[in-house]
Amino acid sequence: MALMILPFIGALSVSESLVAVVTVCLVYLIIKSFQDKIPEGLSRLPGPKPLPIIGNVLEVGSRPYLSLTEMGKRYGNVFQIQIGMRPVVVLSGNETVRQALIKQGDEFAGRPDLYSFRFISEGKSLAFSTDQAGVWRARRKLAYSALRSFSTLEGTTPEYSCVLEEHISKEAKYLIQQLDTVMKADGSFDPFRYIVVSVANVICGMCFGRRYDHHDQELLSLVNLSDEFGQVVGSGNPADFIPILQYLPNKTMKKFVSINDRFISFVQKIVSEHYATFNKDNIRDITDSLIDHCEDRKLDENANVQMSDEKVVGIVNDLFGAGFDTISTALSWSVMYLVAYPEIQEXLYQELKENVGLDRTPVLSDRNNLPLLESFILEIFRHSSFLPFTIPHCTTKDTSLNGYYIPKDTCVFINQWQINHDPELWKEPSSFNPDRFLSADGTEVNKVDGEKVMIFGMGKRRCIGEVIARNEVYLFLAILIQKLHFCNLPGEPLDMTPEYGLTMKHKRCQLRATARVRSDH
C-alpha cells in the first residue's frame, strides 16, 4: 500500500505537492478534533500511532498480511491502523473473527465506500458495492439460487451426475491434451497459463453456455485483465485512503478504470446477446436464469427491492471474474505443491489408484473416498492462504468487539492469513503437512479442523461460490493427478514465494508434466 502512495506523491510538482499537503493536513486536524467519544464501559482501539497524511502505510509495507500479523501480536486481535487518512480496524484470531462475522454478522456486513469500488461493475458489483442490506440480500439470494440450480442440473449424458461435473471433466481432459501438446513442442509448460483458461471455460460454460479455445485472444485478454485487477486491488488505491487524490491525476486509477471498463464491456456484450435470443421456455445458463428473473419478477418476495438489468450484468461479472481467478489460483498452487512434495504426489496417486482405479475418470461422488486428497487441498488453502484478506468489511452501526468501541462506517480488514498460521490453532503452522487434517488411521478428514481454515470468508459475506469452488478444485486435481506426473526442470529450484495481490499468485515458472504410463498400473 505504501508502495502505491509514495510514488504517486513524488510525481506531483512542487506547487501541487504543497497545496495537497496543506489541504490534507487541515482536513486531518479537523477530523482529529471531532474524533468519536468512547461510550462508558468501552475502550479506545489500540494500535500504532499514525503519521499525518500517510498514516501507517510505511509500517504496513508491501506484505500487509505479515506486518499486520506481527502488529496483532503486540496489540491483540482487535486493533486500529490508519491507511492514509482512513481508520481501519484489523481483526485476527479465529474466535474474534467468528464473533464479528457470525454472532455480530449484521453489524460487520457492510462494504466501505471506497472510491475505487465505484468503478467495479460500474458500481453494481454484488461483492464490492455498498448497497443497502435489503437490496444486497435480494441480489445475493438470486445469484446463489442461479449458481446452485445450474451446477446441480443433470448432465447431458448419464456419465455425468450434473452439469458442473460435466464441464469440469471435459475441461480437465482437454487441459491434459493441451499439456501433452505443449510438452512435446517445448518440453515444459507454465502452469498458470494453461490452468486459468481451463477454469475460465468452466465458468464460461456455466454463465454463458459457451467455451473458448485455449488460444482465443479475447479470453486470454480477459484472463490478463483479471490478473491485473487482482494486483491493483490488492496493492491498495491511494485515492481510497487520501480523498483529495481523487481529484488529482492518477495513473493507477486510470489503469484500474480501464481494466473494469474492458471487463464489463465483455460481459455486457454477452448479456445483450442473451437478451436478443432469450426464450423463457429454454433457460440455457446462469445469464438466462437472471434475465428470466428480471422479466418476471422486478420485485423480490417482499416487494421492495428492484432488480435492474444493469445489476444482472454486475452479478454475472462478479460470478465470472471471481469464478476463474480464485479457482485457477488454487489449482495452480496445487500443482506447485505437488512438485514441491513429490512423496505426497505419489501417495495421492496411489490413493486414487486404490479407491477410484485407473480405468475411469474420478467423479464428484468419489470425494469422500479420497481423504488424503481432501486433506491435501485443505492444507494448500491453509498454508498458501492465497486469499490473505477478505474483501474489506464495514460496520453498519456503532458497535463494540472484545470491549473496544468501533464507530459506524469503519473499514474492517479480516486477516485470513493470520488465522491460517495461528500457532494457537495449528501445530507448526509454517510446515506443509496434510496429515494434520487426517484421523489417526488416515481414513477420515477431521471436519472440525477443516472448518478452521479460512479462505472463503465467513458469515453473511461468505463467498457464494464456495461449494462450487471446492468441488472444482477437487475434481480438476483428482483427474490431473490420476493422469499426469508433475516435476520441475532439472537444476531449477522451485520458488514458492507468493506475490501479493487480491489473490496471491506464485511466480510464473516452467514445469514438466508427463503421462502416467501403463506400468503405473
UniProtKB/Swiss-Prot annotation:
Question: Which top EC class is named for this enzyme in its record?
Answer: oxidoreductase
Q: Where does heme bind?
A: 463
User: For this protein, what reaction is catalysed?
Assistant: an organic molecule + reduced [NADPH--hemoprotein reductase] + O2 = an alcohol + oxidized [NADPH--hemoprotein reductase] + H2O + H(+)
* Documented EC number(s): 1.14.14.1
BP GO terms, sorted: hormone biosynthetic process; progesterone metabolic process
What highest taxon heads this organism's lineage? Eukaryota
Name assigned to this protein: Cytochrome P450 1A1
Annotated source species? Chelon saliens (Leaping mullet)
